[in-house]
Swiss-Prot record:
Chain positions of site Interaction with tRNA: H135, Q354
Entry's family note: Belongs to the MnmA/TRMU family.
Subcellular localization: Cytoplasm
Keywords associated with the record: ATP-binding, Cytoplasm, Disulfide bond, Nucleotide-binding, RNA-binding, Transferase, tRNA processing, tRNA-binding
Residue positions of the active site: C109, C208
Region (Interaction with tRNA): 158-160, 321-322
Origin species: Mesoplasma florum (strain ATCC 33453 / NBRC 100688 / NCTC 11704 / L1) (Acholeplasma florum)
Top-level taxon: Bacteria
Taxonomy of the source species: Bacteria, Bacillati, Mycoplasmatota, Mollicutes, Entomoplasmatales
Gene3D superfamilies with a match to the protein in the record: Adenine nucleotide alpha hydrolases-like domains (2.30.30.280), HUPs (3.40.50.620), Translation factors (2.40.30.10)
Catalysed reactions listed for this entry: S-sulfanyl-L-cysteinyl-[protein] + uridine(34) in tRNA + AH2 + ATP = 2-thiouridine(34) in tRNA + L-cysteinyl-[protein] + A + AMP + diphosphate + H(+)
GO terms for cellular component: cytoplasm
Protein name in UniProt: tRNA-specific 2-thiouridylase MnmA
Sites where the protein binds ATP: G8, L9, S10, G11, G12, V13, D14, S15, M34, G134
Biological function: Catalyzes the 2-thiolation of uridine at the wobble position (U34) of tRNA, leading to the formation of s(2)U34.
Amino acid sequence: MKKKVIVGLSGGVDSSVAAYLLIQQGYEVEGLFMRNWDSSANNDILGNQEIDNDVCPQEQDYLDALEVANKLGIKLHRIDFVQEYWEYVFEYFIKEYKKGRTPNPDILCNKYIKFDKFLNHAINELKADYIAMGHYAGVRFNEKTKQYEMIRAVDTNKDQTYFLCQLTQNQLSKTLFPLQSLEKPEIRKIAAEQGLITADKKDSTGICFIGEREFTKFLQNYISNQPGDIVDIKTNEVLGKHIGAMYYTIGQRKGLNLGGMKEPYYVAAKDIDKKIIYVCPASDESYLLSNNAIVTEINWSLDLKQYIDNVEEFECTAKFRYRQPDVKVRLNKIKDNEYKVSYDAIVKAVTPGQEAVFYLNDICLGGGIIDIVE
């Protein structure tokens, strides 16, 4: 009897090809389209250039997913997770920005929506054996350790294990990633050969399930402006004004509106209570550099003791942001799911609220939230 897979059909090329490949591999395949954002209900007005479109982007994505499903000869289900996305992803996202931190909504969306709400619906209601997504990542079962290992994609530029670092053994055991061994041009080629409407569709960017927005204006829908000074961290000189320190992230250069300066300036630190953004010149980036970070709420995607001799103190590599080259790090355990992470390499703009994700060669071990940078 064929195993049943529910594919998260998003209306993009990656999930379209994932569905096609699984059909070719002999699975019984059905699609499930998620609607996670409602611009009207969620007051998504400022910064939304698509608000006056005749067909909203989410609805166009559904129509594209439906056309792909029809072309492949599979059933397409549809489900609404707008309320769940708001509660589990967006409220945290806004709360963190108000604190002056920079959260990663894509990681939260994977943790709480795609691999929780979606997975449970697929398994329990649609009676699937597995779910599948168009992510660039892989899962393999290690017979020796008896662990499901999440591994990097062959296309290193597209690898998305960073965003999947919160997945658990249970979730990995029920997930297929058909695109692990393919690069983007190959995927577009397969889509074109199969006559899929998504073959030339541009990749989605912006906030997970929300899309591209003028970011500061978008946040103004949910956070009130709190103007203050832009201060040179070295000289304490006031260089300009800002409309809200929470709108800026560590390492940011664009959008400071510091005219007449001899060189670019970067956001080096923020004081939310005093409404101050501290900046440093490009010629002195020492204020952006760090050697240690405290990482909290770490999720280990596998049983770490099967891979690391001493889990109290060990070395591996890490990424502190998406597409950053791996950095060699030393981890010292503070308490359960909290480690001090030290690195000798010069790492710029490690940012509180973002995720630190840990690797052992091609295996993603898991990740946690950067809480304090030293």
